[in-house]
C-alpha cells in the first residue's frame, strides 16, 4: 500500500470515528482493500490518540470558524494533516499539504481543497 492510499484509507477510518462510538479497531475493520501497513496504522492510531491536542491546535488556526462548524470531511482531513505535521516531522510539510489538498479533491467539493490549503498554509507558516 502506497502512502497516498494509506492516507485515503486513514481518512475513511477517521471519518467513521468522528461522532460515533466505534473503536479504532472496529472502524479499521470496515475499510476494505489491501492489507494494512505500519504507516497507515500509525496515522490512524496517532490521530485518534492525539485528537484533543490536534483539535486545540486547529481551533487556534481557524478564522471565523469553529471546528464543530466545519464540514466533516474538511475537519477529518485537517486532523490527519495536523497529526502528520506535528508528530511525523520526517514527512516534508509540502508533501503533507499536497496530500491534504488531494484528499479534499477526492472526497470533498471544490471549496474544500482551497479552505484546507488556507488553514494548513497558515498553520505551517506559524509553526
Swiss-Prot record:
Pfam name, any one: NusB
Entries under InterPro entries matching the protein: NusB-like_sf (IPR035926), NusB_fam (IPR011605), NusB_RsmB_TIM44 (IPR006027)
Transmembrane portions of the chain: none
A Gene Ontology biological process term: DNA-templated transcription termination
Gene Ontology CC entries for this record: cytosol
Top-level lineage group: Bacteria
Keywords, in A-Z order: RNA-binding, Transcription, Transcription antitermination, Transcription regulation
MF GO annotations: RNA binding
Family membership noted in the UniProt record: Belongs to the NusB family.
Function: Involved in transcription antitermination. Required for transcription of ribosomal RNA (rRNA) genes. Binds specifically to the boxA antiterminator sequence of the ribosomal RNA (rrn) operons.
Protein name, as recorded: Transcription antitermination protein NusB
Amino acid at each position: 500500500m502506497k502512502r497516498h492510499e494509506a492516507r485515503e484509507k486513514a481518512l475513511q477510518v477517521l471519518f467513521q470515528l468522528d461522532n460515533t462510538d466505534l473503536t479504532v479497531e472496529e472502524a479499521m475493520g470496515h475499510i476494505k482493500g489491501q492489507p494494512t501497513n505500519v504507516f497507515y496504522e500509525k496515522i490512524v492510531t496517532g490521530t485518534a490518540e492525539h485528537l484533543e491536542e490536534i483539535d486545540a491546535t486547529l481551533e487556534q488556526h481557524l478564522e471565523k470558524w469553529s471546528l464543530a462548524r466545519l464540514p466533516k470531511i474538511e475537519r477529518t482531513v485537517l486532523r490527519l494533516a495536523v497529526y502528520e505535521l506535528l508528530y511525523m516531522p520526517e514527512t516534508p510539510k509540502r508533501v503533507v499539504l499536497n496530500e491534504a489538498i488531494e484528499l479534499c479533491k477526492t472526497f470533498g467539493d471544490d471549496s474544500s481543497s482551497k479552505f484546507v490549503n488556507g488553514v494548513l498554509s497558515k498553520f505551517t507558516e506559524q509553526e
